[in-house]
Amino acid sequence: MSKPVRMEPGVKLRDGDKMALIPVKFMPDPNEEVLRKPDWMRIKLPPSSQKIEHIKSTLRKNKLHSVCEEASCPNLAECFNHGTATFMIMGAICTRRCPFCDVAHGRPLALDPDEPKKLALTIKEMGLKYVVITSVDRDDLRDGGAQHFADCIKQIREHSPQTRIEILTPDFRGRMEQALEVFRETPPDVFNHNLETAPRMYRVARPGADYKWSLELLRRIKEMHPHVPTKSGVMMGLGETNEEIVQVLKDLREHGVNMLTLGQYLQPSRHHLPVKRYVPPAEFDELKDVAMGLGFSHAACGPFVRSSYHADLQAKGEEVK
């Protein structure tokens, strides 16, 4: 009999330890044959560069986190080489345990009250003109962390008034009203919240989340701040159908969402949900045409597209694949 996993404050649980705590009957079979990556999914990673090392050392120096590293993003080298990073606030331990995600699960530590200012000064030091701020889920906080997002927005605007700010938020489960009150006074320049997958896949892929709740959050933000673009991201390759994805796009548009990212799911480890299929680039192109036909102002669709991948270009309406 396996030893029960202990939840100690500040301890990161990953891979098998994290997956053992997911309260769903279906679990990936570690012995299941892994699909071979097709040619279009093979990229040559650039060697480490001064820019990559500078960004990593800057983050370490200021005790900050990037989702690029914590979620093992395949675009890390490209983005860091371009001098961009997506900052992850409120620590690197998530209270959720989604089996597609590589961010660690556990009991997070208390918020760092100095983080908003440290983040703002780091952004100023790096000379960033467009930043994406995301976070782990913090179901332990009364407002789900909304005020901490707002504090970061205020500090960035104080120290770098020309910098545009996109936030990629959790769903504020059970705390939507508190979060909306916070964002009423401190909206970002772009509000992003990912649906991640089709509703049929939620029980397996997003335990603890609710498809309709996420759509309602996006709708309420748009209703409150009509001038703020709203954005959402979806993965493919978890077992959904293209027809289900098209319905997700329709649902997003019906809830006022302006911008879309659509990319290929990649399995972080053998303990995570397996890739059920690799979607050919031509299908992403077709889905982009569908998205634009539905009225999205911008749709970044391609195998390596992620929520914050070239987010500055997405916000300008430039082509991203």
UniProtKB/Swiss-Prot annotation:
Essential cofactor(s): [4Fe-4S] cluster
Source organism, top-level taxon: Bacteria
Pfam families, per database record: LIAS_N (PF16881), Radical_SAM (PF04055)
InterPro entries the UniProt entry points to: Aldolase_TIM, Elp3/MiaA/NifB-like_rSAM, LIAS_N, Lipoyl_synth, rSAM
Pathway listed: Protein modification; protein lipoylation via endogenous pathway; protein N(6)-(lipoyl)lysine from octanoyl-[acyl-carrier-protein]: step 2/2
Residues the entry annotates as binding [4Fe-4S] cluster 2: C94, C98, C101
Main location class: cytoplasm
The keyword Membrane is assigned to this record: no
Binding site residues for [4Fe-4S] cluster 1: C68, C73, C79, S308
One GO location term (cellular component): cytoplasm
Co-factor note (free text): Binds 2 [4Fe-4S] clusters per subunit. One cluster is coordinated with 3 cysteines and an exchangeable S-adenosyl-L-methionine.
GO molecular function ontology, one term from the record: lipoate synthase activity
Residue ranges of every copy of the Radical SAM core domain listed in the record: 80-297
Catalytic activity: [[Fe-S] cluster scaffold protein carrying a second [4Fe-4S](2+) cluster] + N(6)-octanoyl-L-lysyl-[protein] + 2 oxidized [2Fe-2S]-[ferredoxin] + 2 S-adenosyl-L-methionine + 4 H(+) = [[Fe-S] cluster scaffold protein] + N(6)-[(R)-dihydrolipoyl]-L-lysyl-[protein] + 4 Fe(3+) + 2 hydrogen sulfide + 2 5'-deoxyadenosine + 2 L-methionine + 2 reduced [2Fe-2S]-[ferredoxin]
Transmembrane segments: none
The enzyme's E.C. designation: 2.8.1.8
Keywords noted in UniProt: 4Fe-4S, Cytoplasm, Iron, Iron-sulfur, Metal-binding, S-adenosyl-L-methionine, Transferase
Localization: Cytoplasm
HAMAP family xrefs: Lipoyl_synth
Assigned protein family: Belongs to the radical SAM superfamily. Lipoyl synthase family.
Name recorded for this polypeptide: Lipoyl synthase
Organism name: Aeromonas hydrophila subsp. hydrophila (strain ATCC 7966 / DSM 30187 / BCRC 13018 / CCUG 14551 / JCM 1027 / KCTC 2358 / NCIMB 9240 / NCTC 8049)
